[in-house]
Amino acid sequence: MSREDASQIVEQGDIFFFYRPKVGAEEVSSAEDVQRFYMVTALEEKDRKYRLFILGRKKLPEIVEGKSTSEERNWALNTLTTNNPEDIRKELLAAEYETETKGKRRVAAAAPAGEGKYSIVKHDNHTEFVYALELPEVPGPIQREFEIKKEASYIMSVKNPDIQIPGFKTFEKRTPQYPESLKKEFGDRRWINIEDPKLLDYENTQLLLIGARKKDVEEELGINLNEEKETANTAEIFRELKIRKDQVPLKPLLKGEFPGKGEQQPMAAEVKQLSREEAPGRGGKVGGKAAATRAPSAAAIAKLLSGINFPKRKNELIVHAEANKAKVEAAEEVIQVIKELPERTYSNMADVEKAVAEVR
């Protein structure tokens, strides 16, 4: 069987990557300064369909040729599917909300970090999510930070919402409302391939991405993504999604560079107002992972870290938590949160709880 015979395109279109800085961040120099990392797909068909996904760990899975790593897999969560690109644009706007202790807070608009073409391909006995980057022409520091490659592919599977899986317990109250016709496709399997792309259309659809390849992707799969040479004047991200150039920093998209201090938050003409329930950390779409999942209780974290002698680095927190797994129900869920904490030294439990609030 030839490579071309082995691959079948399930769907294809345009892909866009965005990141949103943390509340109050004046400058972004790494993923630690980022609240959310987004992926937007725009299906290539007469009636365009747009999907907004949140990526876990604030980056794509790592791909290391010929080597398996702990970072090679990641989750993605559908938070919006629409036929109107204006809905996507509004989700990415700057936002303001009121807090009881600090008054009005502002969240910067999501900044574009990449544009390209994507395909979902049925290959042998699995499906792969494939993309080729058009902007920036040469990936820079900001793309490396989010693991955005010039081209890459990932084995992609959809989670059965009726089966609880270790590491996905945080999603148990966020389940996609599939019709019976799609539910039947899962049977008793935990994960299924994406042979029907409608599986991706439902809010709260949960995906697993496993890094597969990062070079010669089109040749290996026998497909053509039809990527084009784009500029600031031709970029689909501005034409298709109606993102205004004066409202977002352009360096990440066009040069692959982090914006300098004062460049991260242009004077946006449009700012949406959030309720307290929509605010970061309260379940809203603007926040960190907490906005997509339930944050673990402080008591659960304290149990896993009981007996620890501070100060400790993050890796030491993880080791201690792993040793105390038997003390906490759904310990893997809590340990996953600890793994997402910023790389720094923690002086006490208050430091840990503050960091949890940053990522959740």
Where do the model's predicted regions map?
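Long, contiguous regulatory modules within eukaryotic nuclear regulatory proteins
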Residues: 1-57
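A structural detector for beta-sheet-dominated domains
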Residues: 18-20, 56, 78, 121, ...
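Conserved beta-strand elements of beta-rich interaction domains across eukaryotes
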Residues: 22-24, 44-48, 57-62, 82, ...
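Intrinsically disordered, low-complexity coil segments
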Residues: 26-30, 44-46, 66-67, 325-334
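Acidic, aromatic-enriched beta-alpha/helix-loop junctions
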Residues: 47-93
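Intrinsically disordered, low-complexity juxtamembrane tails/stalks of eukaryotic membrane proteins
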Residues: 88-108
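A eukaryote-biased signal for long
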Residues: 103-279
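Basic helix-extension-helix modules of the SAP/HeH family
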Residues: 272-360
